[in-house]
Amino acid sequence: MDSIISAASVIAAGLAVGLAAIGPGIGQGTASAQAVEGIARQPEAEGKIRGTLLLSLAFMEALTIYGLVVALSLLFANPFINQ
């Protein structure tokens, strides 16, 4: 039974990282495209746009890191496997 739980945990860890990277990846691409467009329209606002973009990219990247933490806990500190 532990081997089935271990196999499911590995699959779940892979899905956690993969799915946690899709949303922020799309969001970062969209945010960067809009920032470039905004800088092209108003070059004088480049500093404010860049600062806001970097802060929002950091928040989006945090979601991916949370997925990685879930995956690592499933792999190395799995609560479903009896030790």
UniProtKB/Swiss-Prot annotation:
Give the record's keywords alphabetically.
ATP synthesis, CF(0), Chloroplast, Hydrogen ion transport, Ion transport, Lipid-binding, Membrane, Plastid, Thylakoid, Transmembrane, Transmembrane helix, Transport
User: Where does the protein principally reside?
Assistant: plastid
Is Plastid a UniProt keyword of this protein? yes
Q: Which GO terms describe its molecular function?
A: lipid binding; proton-transporting ATP synthase activity, rotational mechanism
Q: Mind telling me which CDD domains this protein's record contains?
A: ATP-synt_Fo_c_ATPH (cd18183)
**What other facts are recorded?**
In plastids the F-type ATPase is also known as CF(1)CF(0).
Know the name of this protein?
ATP synthase subunit c, chloroplastic
> Which species is this UniProt entry from?
Galdieria sulphuraria
